[in-house]
């Protein structure tokens, strides 16, 4: 099989977005905010800015390096989408007998879940990064510019209400992700 020595992937930059590349550190600025990400763990990968295009490339193209180039390009695309449109996850509060109360503590960056399965103590889920969490009725809406922080926060809330020692087909109480995508 022929060996490929150069693999590059290009990411187009929209007009209302500014991208700065400093070695393997990429900063993306847009209407919704700023995201900085360090890709210094990626050995043998180079990132450069040319006109309105970010080029991610490698010159030693084995299977892992090819995958790494694609992964970094996808991360940069997600960063651009985040600063232009943002990301939103929606979670549903589901209970059958004990009414669950959810409140957001902005100061301590946590979500407090009260009366889950009739428990006396609160369950606590962490809010990651600069993510906005809003509770409206039986829905929890999580919005932010970094897809990883939004996803981590949603997973933290879902994991905090996991039912362990009961049959999940019967005890369906909890908070579950039902929609995720771009916030428009």
Swiss-Prot record:
Signal peptide stretch: none
Disulfide bridge positions per record: none
A GO cellular-component term linked to this record: cytosolic large ribosomal subunit
Coiled coil segments of this chain: none
Keyword annotations of the record: Ribonucleoprotein, Ribosomal protein, RNA-binding, rRNA-binding
Entry superkingdom: Archaea
InterPro entries on file: Ribosomal_uL6-like, Ribosomal_uL6-like_a/b-dom_sf, Ribosomal_uL6_a/b-dom, Ribosomal_uL6_arc
UniProt keyword Ribonucleoprotein present: yes
Gene Ontology biological-process entries: cytoplasmic translation
Keyword Transport in annotation: no
NCBIfam families linked to this entry: PRK05518.1, uL6_arch
UniProt similarity note: Belongs to the universal ribosomal protein uL6 family.
Record-linked PANTHER family: 60S RIBOSOMAL PROTEIN L9 (PTHR11655:SF16), 60S/50S RIBOSOMAL PROTEIN L6/L9 (PTHR11655)
Complex formation: Part of the 50S ribosomal subunit.
Protein name: Large ribosomal subunit protein uL6
Organism encoding this protein: Desulfurococcus amylolyticus (strain DSM 18924 / JCM 16383 / VKM B-2413 / 1221n) (Desulfurococcus kamchatkensis)
Record lineage: Archaea, Thermoproteota, Thermoprotei, Desulfurococcales, Desulfurococcaceae
């Amino acid at each position: 099989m022929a060996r490929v020595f150069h693999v590059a992937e290009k990411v187009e930059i929209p007009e209302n977005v500014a991208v700065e590349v400093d070695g393997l550190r990429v900063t993306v600025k847009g209407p919704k905010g700023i995201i900085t990400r360090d890709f210094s763990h990626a050995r043998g990968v180079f990132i450069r800015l040319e006109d309105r295009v970010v080029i991610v490339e490698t010159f030693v193209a084995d299977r892992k390096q090819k995958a790494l180039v694609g992964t970094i390009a996808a991360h940069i695309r997600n960063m651009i989408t985040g600063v232009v449109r943002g990301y939103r996850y929606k979670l549903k509060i589901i209970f059958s007998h004990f009414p669950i109360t959810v409140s957001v503590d902005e100061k301590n960056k946590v979500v407090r879940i009260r009366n889950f399965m009739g428990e006396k103590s609160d369950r606590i889920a962490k809010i990651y990064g600069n993510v906005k969490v809003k509770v409206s009725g039986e829905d929890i809406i999580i919005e932010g510019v970094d897809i990883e922080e939004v996803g981590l926060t949603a997973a933290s809330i879902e994991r905090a209400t996991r039912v362990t020692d009961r049959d999940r087909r019967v005890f369906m109480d909890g908070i579950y992700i039902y929609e995720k995508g771009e916030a428009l």
